[in-house]
Amino acid sequence: MKFGTVWKYYFTESLLKATIRTPSQLNLAPNALRPVLDQLCRLFPQNPTVQIRPIRLAGVRGEEIKAQASATQLIFHIHGGAFFLGSLNTHRALMTDLASRTQMQVIHVDYPLAPEHPYPEAIDAIFDVYQALLVQGIKPKDIIISGDSCGANLALALSLRLKQQPELMPSGLILMSPYLDLTLTSESLRFNQKHDALLSIEALQAGIKHYLTDDIQPGDPRVSPLFDDLDGLPPTLVQVGSKEILLDDSKRFREKAEQADVKVHFKLYTGMWNNFQMFNAWFPEAKQALADIAEFATSLDLD
C-alpha cells in the first residue's frame, strides 16, 4: 500500500473519530447531534447521473431516486443512526450511488426517530411504507429491502414481520453493517471499540435508552431480530467491515441464518469501519461493496 493511500485512510479515520465518534460518547442531546451529522454528510458527493424526486408514502417523507435506465426492481432502503440519528440528508449521496450502480429505483424515507418516537413507531411506519408501495402496484418480487446499521435491524424486522404473509416477502434483503443485537453481547464490541472510526458503544447505549420503552427488553426478538426465527427469509447479502464493533452481529446472523437454510451472501471488507459504504467516492473497499450490491441485486432480477 502506497504512503499516500495509508495517509488517506489514517486521515479519514482520525477525522471521523474527532467529529462523529467522540461527540457520540459525550451523551449529547439528539437535537444537538442531528444537524452536525447532516452538515458533515454534505461532504459526500451526490451522483449526478440520477434523478431525485420528493415523495410521501403512508404519511412519511421520502425520496425516489431513479437511474437513467428503466429498472424492474426497486430497492427500499432504511437508513441507520442508532435509532435516533440519520435522515434523507445523511444518506442521500449513498442512495444516489446505489441507484446509479444498480440501475434500479431507490426509495428511502425519513422514518420517525427516537426519543420523540420510541419503539414501535419506526418499524410500524416502515411497514406502512412497504404496504403503500404494494398498493401502488409494485410486486413483492420486484422489491429488495435494504438497510444500514440500525436500519438493517429495521429491514430484518420488517422482513420477519412479512413472514406472517409469505406472499408479501421481498425478493431479497441487503444488510449493511447490521446492528441486530441490542443486548450488546457481541465480542467485537470490545475488541474493535478502538478500531471502529465511526460508531461507539456509547452511541449504541444512548440509542437503546432512547428507542426502548420500559415494557420491552433489549433481548426481545422484535427489537433484536438476531434472536428471532430466521427461517423463510429471502436471499440475504450481508456486508461488514473488519474494524466494526458490530462485526460479530453479522457473523452470528450468518451462522444462524444458514442453519435456517437462508441463502446468505457474506462479504467481509478488510480495514473498514461502520457504514463504510458511504465512503465509496474515496475508498476501493467501499466502491467494491456497491459493486457487490449491484451483482447481488441483479442476480435476484435474473432468478
UniProtKB/Swiss-Prot annotation:
It is found in: Secreted. SUPFAM superfamilies: alpha/beta-Hydrolases. One of its GO terms (molecular function) is carboxylic ester hydrolase activity. It comes from the Bacteria. Transmembrane segments: none annotated. Belongs to the 'GDXG' lipolytic enzyme family. Acinetobacter lwoffii RAG-1 has the ability to grow on simple triglycerides such as triacetin; mutants defective in esterase lose this ability, but retain the ability to grow on acetate. This is Esterase. It comes from Acinetobacter venetianus (strain ATCC 31012 / DSM 23050 / BCRC 14357 / CCUG 45561 / CIP 110063 / KCTC 2702 / LMG 19082 / RAG-1). The lineage of its organism: Bacteria, Pseudomonadati, Pseudomonadota, Gammaproteobacteria, Moraxellales.
